[in-house]
């Protein structure tokens, strides 16, 4: 059962409570390239990104934040490290949320200045704890970025913001070690009702990043923990968005758009099952209808394995049986099985 947290409004998206889990990503174009950032932001929006983070190393770089915000219709989060004046500049240009890393933002007075700027414009703050940048005294106390250390860091900064009468807060508590990350989120969720941004940081190269994020983020969601997610990949941010939605689908959340399932194939396969499945998925990119499509390797187990699909095929030599909701309907034959199948999909 989902652990319900207080609601926080980020631009036109509300997280927490019973609101849908929002999928985030972060631009990776150098901040000096404003045109490149705007173009990438538009691609992320088209891919379904719901909350978009942009780095802001200095106050002067707030102009990139402003340009991106004016170019898309999704909330923009300013990612702030070291320079609290960058956060103040982003608040001035109307950013929708500010993320600060407590380990490097500076002393309490600087945090207070950021809080006051956000209070004036009702801008939420994400406390972004990262296992790689814990405060020195906390790291010295625990010896390593163990879950208890990360939770202590997060709660210290929550209490600091609360001391300044600020509670428009989101928390993340990321680690590249999946078991540590999961245990940290469990401990944090047990002691706070602020919404949680869930992710695995420094997850590795693309394939390993997918695996670690699937295990870490998916595992947390299955435990009812998480209000917004970001899949960190060494890839274009659009791929992070796609992966985020796939994780939500995999753990049972209703997600708009099609899901393509296929079998791993075996020696019984007599038609290009994998190639057809990949092409079906490619052609259905951007298709908004929520349907499950199955492409199965043979008629032995195919229909049974894909019984819960809305539509599917199970192939044979030069033909494929079309089934709808697990029931065989007709045979598709010839050299254009894929095209015939796509025609049937669009009828569903």
Show the residue positions of the predicted features.
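N-terminal amphipathic alpha-helix/helix-capping segment at the start of soluble metabolic enzymes
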Residues: 1-26, 119, 282
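Active-site mouth loops of central-metabolism enzymes
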Residues: 18-36, 55, 74-82, 138-151, ...
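Hydrophobic or amphipathic alpha-helical targeting/insertion segments
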Residues: 85-126
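Glycine-rich, proline-tolerant flexible connector loops at the mouths of alpha/beta enzymes
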Residues: 34, 45-69, 99-107, 169-178
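Alpha-helix-loop-beta-strand connector modules within alpha/beta enzyme cores
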Residues: 59-80, 113-125, 185-196, 280-284
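Glycine-enriched alpha-helix->loop->beta-strand junction motifs that scaffold or abut catalytic
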Residues: 71-74, 92-98, 119-122, 189-195, ...
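Catalytic alpha/beta core domains of metabolic enzymes, predominantly
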Residues: 129-133, 138-285
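Hydrophobic faces of well-ordered beta-strands that scaffold small-molecule active sites
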Residues: 21-27, 52-54, 76-80, 98-100, ...
């Amino acid at each position: 059962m989902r652990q319900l947290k207080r609601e926080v409004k980020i631009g036109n998206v509300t997280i927490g409570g019973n609101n849908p889990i929002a999928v985030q990503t972060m631009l990776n174009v150098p901040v000096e390239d404003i045109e490149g950032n705007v173009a990438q932001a538009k691609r992320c929006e088209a891919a379904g990104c719901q909350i978009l983070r942009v780095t802001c190393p200095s106050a002067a770089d707030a102009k990139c934040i402003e340009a991106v915000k004016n170019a898309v219709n999704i909330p923009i989060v300013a990612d702030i490290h070291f320079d609290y004046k960058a956060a103040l500049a982003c608040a001035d240009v109307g950013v929708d949320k500010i993320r600060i890393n407590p380990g490097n933002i500076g002393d309490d007075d600087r945090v207070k200045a950021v809080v006051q700027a956000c209070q004036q414009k009702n801008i939420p703050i994400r406390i972004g704890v990262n296992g790689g940048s814990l405060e020195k005294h906390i790291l010295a106390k625990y010896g390593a970025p163990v879950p208890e250390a990360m939770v202590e860091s997060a709660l210290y900064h929550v209490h600091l913001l609360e001391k300044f009468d600020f509670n428009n807060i989101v928390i993340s508590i990321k680690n590249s070690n999946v078991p540590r990350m999961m245990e940290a989120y469990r401990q944090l969720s047990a002691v706070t009702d602020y919404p949680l941004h869930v992710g695995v940081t420094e997850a590795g190269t693309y394939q390993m990043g997918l695996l670690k994020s699937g295990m870490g983020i998916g595992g947390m969601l299955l435990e009812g923990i998480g209000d917004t997610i970001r899949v960190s990949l060494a890839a274009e941010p659009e791929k992070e968005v796609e992966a985020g939605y796939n994780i939500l689908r995999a753990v049972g959340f209703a997600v708009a758009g099609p899901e393509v399932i296929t079998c791993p194939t075996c020696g019984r396969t007599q038609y290009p099952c994998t190639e057809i499945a990949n092409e079906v998925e490619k052609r259905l990119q951007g298709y908004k209808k929520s349907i499950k499509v199955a492409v199965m390797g043979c008629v032995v187990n195919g229909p049974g394995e894909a019984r819960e699909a809305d539509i599917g095929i199970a192939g044979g030599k030069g033909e494929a049986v079309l089934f709808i909701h697990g029931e065989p309907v007709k045979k598709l034959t010839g050299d254009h099985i894929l095209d015939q199948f796509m025609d049937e999909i669009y009828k569903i």
